[in-house]
Amino acid sequence: MKKQEKELMLKQIIEFERQTMFKLDVKNDKPYYQGFLMSTSDYLPDNLVIDGELRCFKESKKLPKGLKVKKKLDISETNITEIPYDCEFGSLDMSETKITKLRDNLELDELRTYNSSLQQLPKGLKVKGTLCISNTGITKIPDDCEFSELFSQDSKLTKLRDNLTLNYLNVRNSLLTELPKGLKVNGDLDISYTDIAEIPDDCDFDSLYMCSTRITRLRDNLILSDLWIDNSFLKELPKNLVVFNMLKMTNKSITALPIDCLVNRI
């Protein structure tokens, strides 16, 4: 490291510590912090490495150059409008921000974009866990996008690709009008308040929430953890239905449980 660069780094560290009362180390010629850091991002020194998580305060307006956050970078509800191209992070929460673009080929543990200004997902996005695009203007998910859980309630999402296998899917009150072929959800499937009118016979799920939908039929022999059918168009329960936890219904057309229906509680 050149003398001038080192002097600038030390100057930035001193100013950061004066503003925040947090102490930084120097490791491999870079500012270093281990643990969970909460700060106004404007005070962060360039090339800071955080071996943990960073939560930026609401008044934050920009991120420093060369920031690396090994775990979660939380800039939700801040005034940050862009993420530098050289910024690295394990997970990102950019909810309630004016950010409009993410760089291509991101690989993350989680991505939360709730109520942000993001209009489309980047190319080559890979999310190991939760992808949240709720209450955004995103209308489609690229075919090369990978994720294991999707939160897309109150969104403009209109289509999902075929043969998805997920741990959780919530498209409540979205613009989705049909479920894709070969959909498999290991946990909850929530399609409440959508215009989805039928569930494909090859669709698998552990729990189903279909309140206020136009669905009139469920296939026989379903075994579920929960089933919520409030205000749906369902006129009768399927044969041999098993619900381990709760069957929630206010459908006036269904007045009694069939003899072959097993339910823990209603």
Can you annotate each of these PLM segments?
Residues K3-E7, R18-T20, G66, K72, ...:
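Intrinsic disorder/low-complexity segments enriched in polar/small residues
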